[in-house]
């Protein structure tokens, strides 16, 4: 008697259906189970509202115990690296978010060396990932590479400062830079547009590479294409952050209350906060891919080239040492051979003298 075939493996309604179409669902389930990792760096002068904006973006308090330094402490203050990691879960999707803050940037009178600490940190994360990737246990690598850098630009100037230009050029081949105009509520709409245009012109003039959003695919829906167009047109993003809930038009909103009215953080007519958050969420995967395929690969290639030359030099040094030792051994062997020959000649001469003396006796 033949066994009955399990009905769950029979699909009579769609003959010829193999099931490859289910692969994206498998990838999705695996990704959701594993969770996602993202590292965001924020850089800018003190007082531009970096911490407030980050707390507003992710609806959390990443800096509950921060102490604001006084003016005297800022004069000789050096750049520090403060990494805060939080686990965020939304509808079953887990995100391990690391925010790297850089307090002290631009505060000291002499900012000549303020880049070094930040650049060293970025390179150290690349180096750590390269080391882990080259190890035996590669299944559980924690990705601490910096995937995006929000660079905060002061709204009180007339464009980029020399410090802004120098810093962005120092890191633009290492990380995705997203320029952000801080405290946009200090500017009128016309002032904001003029400042944006001036910053973009200076970025192009100095050949600074910022993160460019990829074009929408031709098969994307029109709403997504329009969203992408609006996001691109908003760079650099002019933003307002606030941790306070205030009442506006009968509802509680995050915002700032002024004598002349209310600035709502999440109102796209007031600032680009929602656009910045939308860009970060919808392009998080692309930011990671650009980090992996461009910035990390550049670092890895340069690192392996330097490592190759280093090994080559070490091998040359070893060969040179071996040659020198072989030459030294040959010299010692020749010296010993000469000494043996001299001793043999002396012994032969001594035997002759002894014989004649005996003969005379």
Swiss-Prot record:
Major localisation: cytoplasm
Keyword vocabulary terms for this entry: Acetylation, Cell cycle, Cell division, Cell membrane, Cell projection, Cilium, Cytoplasm, Cytoskeleton, Differentiation, Flagellum, GTP-binding, Membrane, Mitosis, Nucleotide-binding, Phosphoprotein, Spermatogenesis
Site (Important for dimerization): 156
The keyword NADP belongs to this UniProt entry's keyword annotation: no
Region listing for G4 motif, in residue ranges: 182-185
Modified residues (N6-acetyllysine): 190
CC annotations in GO: cell cortex; ciliary membrane; cleavage furrow; cytoplasm; midbody; motile cilium; spindle
GO biological-process terms attached to the record: cell differentiation; cell division; cilium assembly; smoothened signaling pathway; spermatogenesis
Residue list for modification Phosphotyrosine: 17, 211
Region (Important for dimerization) residue spans: 260-270
PTM sites of type Phosphoserine: 218
Positions bound to GTP: 44-51, 78, 104, 183-191, 241, 256
Annotated region described as G1 motif, given as residue ranges: 44-51
Protein name: Septin-2
Gene name as annotated: SEPTIN2
């Amino acid at each position: 008697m033949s066994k009955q075939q399990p009905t769950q493996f029979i699909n009579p309604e769609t003959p010829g259906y193999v099931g490859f179409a289910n692969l994206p669902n498998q990838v999705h389930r695996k990704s959701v189970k594993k969770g996602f990792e993202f590292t965001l760096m924020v850089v800018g002068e003190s007082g531009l509202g970096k911490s407030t904006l980050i707390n507003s973006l992710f609806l959390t308090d990443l800096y509950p115990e921060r102490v604001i330094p006084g003016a005297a402490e800022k004069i000789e203050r050096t750049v520090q690296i403060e990494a805060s990691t939080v686990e965020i879960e939304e509808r079953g999707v887990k995100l391990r978010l690391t925010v790297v803050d850089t307090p002290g940037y631009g505060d000291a009178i002499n900012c000549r060396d303020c880049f070094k600490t930040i650049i060293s940190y970025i390179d150290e994360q690349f180096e750590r990932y390269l080391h882990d990737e080259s190890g035996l246990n590669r299944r559980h690598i924690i990705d601490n590479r910096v995937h995006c850098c929000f660079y905060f630009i002061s709204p009180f100037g007339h464009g980029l400062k020399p410090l802004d230009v120098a810093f962005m050029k120092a890191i633009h081949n290492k990380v995705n830079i997203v320029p952000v105009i801080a405290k946009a509520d200090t500017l009128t709409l016309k002032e904001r547009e003029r400042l944006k245009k001036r910053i973009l012109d200076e970025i192009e003039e100095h050949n600074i590479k910022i993160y460019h959003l990829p074009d929408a695919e031709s098969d994307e829906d029109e709403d997504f294409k329009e969203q992408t167009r609006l996001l691109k047109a908003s760079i650099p993003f002019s933003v307002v952050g606030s941790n306070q809930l205030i009442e506006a038009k009968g509802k509680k909103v995050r915002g700032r209350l002024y004598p002349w009215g209310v600035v709502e953080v999440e109102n796209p007519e007031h600032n680009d906060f929602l656009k910045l958050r939308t860009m970060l969420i919808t392009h998080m995967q692309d930011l990671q891919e650009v980090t992996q395929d461009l910035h990390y690969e550049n670092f890895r290639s340069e690192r392996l080239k330097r490592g190759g030359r280093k090994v080559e030099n070490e091998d040359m040094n070893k060969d040179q040492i071996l040659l020198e030792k072989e030459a030294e051994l040959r010299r010692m062997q020749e010296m010993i051979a000469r000494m043996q020959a001299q001793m043999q000649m002396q012994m032969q001469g001594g035997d002759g003298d002894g014989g004649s003396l005996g003969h005379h006796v």
